[in-house]
């Protein structure tokens, strides 16, 4: 109940948030297409049980040097609520939190051409080798943090892993149609794998 009540303030379907979403989509099309190479190390260890896969780090994530780095991205908040912990703030805290809860974090792509943070603009994708993690960790389930990540995984990675991916809603601030309550409910599915 505590998590539910705290989450009420995070529903981003307010008028102001809708305007921010529209503004973000507008500006993403003004940005130039650029070639992006993934530079973050995957987060995992030999006790990781679930693998959370995004598509590629956003410009803001690349700026701060870590996964889901946009201040309005709800990834770390929803995972911490699902795990019953405080939201990790620093890069070190996020790594410690993920490993303590048997969560591996990476992205589907090692590189691509993309316009801003707009996954729909991705061209010439180059996939990461998921077996880097799978051969070391007892991964029981793989989750995509958005439809594009799931689509790319199924196209480029599934043939090598043989593990189906479960698609969860995006935690991106651009995904304002999904409330925090809906995110929390969707991401709660990981509990059965990490306990």
State where each predicted segment sits:
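Low-acidity, Ser/Thr- and Arg-rich intrinsically disordered low-complexity segments
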Residues: 4-17, 21-28
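C-terminal capping/extension of enzyme domains
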Residues: 25-49, 71, 118-131, 154-195
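Short, hydrophobic/glycine-enriched beta-strand segments
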Residues: 49-55
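Short histidine/acidic/glycine/proline-rich micro-motifs that form metal-
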Residues: 66, 139, 172-174
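Internal catalytic-core helix/loop-beta-alpha segment
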Residues: 100-149
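Short catalytic/ligand-binding loop motif for oxyanion handling, primarily in non-cytosolic enzymes
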Residues: 59-62, 113-116, 150-153, 173-177
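Short, surface-exposed acidic-centric catalytic microdomains
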Residues: 60-121
């Amino acid at each position: 109940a505590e998590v539910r009540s705290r989450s009420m303030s995070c529903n981003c379907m307010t008028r102001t948030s809708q305007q921010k979403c529209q503004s973000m989509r507008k500006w993403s099309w003004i940005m130039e297409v650029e070639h992006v190479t993934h530079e973050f190390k995957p987060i995992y260890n030999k006790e990781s049980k679930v693998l959370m896969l995004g598509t590629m780090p956003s410009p803001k994530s690349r700026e701060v040097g870590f996964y889901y780095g946009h201040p309005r991205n709800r990834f770390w908040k929803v995972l911490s609520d699902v795990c019953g912990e405080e939201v990790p703030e620093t890069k070190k805290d996020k790594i410690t939190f993920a490993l303590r809860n048997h969560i591996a974090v990476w992205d589907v792509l090692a590189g691509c051409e993309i316009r801003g943070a707009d996954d729909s603009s991705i061209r010439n994708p180059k996939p990461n080798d998921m077996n880097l993690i799978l051969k070391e960790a007892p991964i029981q389930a793989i989750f995509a943090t958005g439809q594009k990540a799931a689509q790319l995984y199924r196209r480029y990675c599934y043939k090598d892993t043989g593990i189906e991916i479960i698609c969860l809603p995006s935690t991106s601030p651009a995904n304002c149609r999904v409330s925090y309550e809906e995110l929390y409910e969707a991401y709660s599915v990981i509990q059965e794998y990490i306990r």
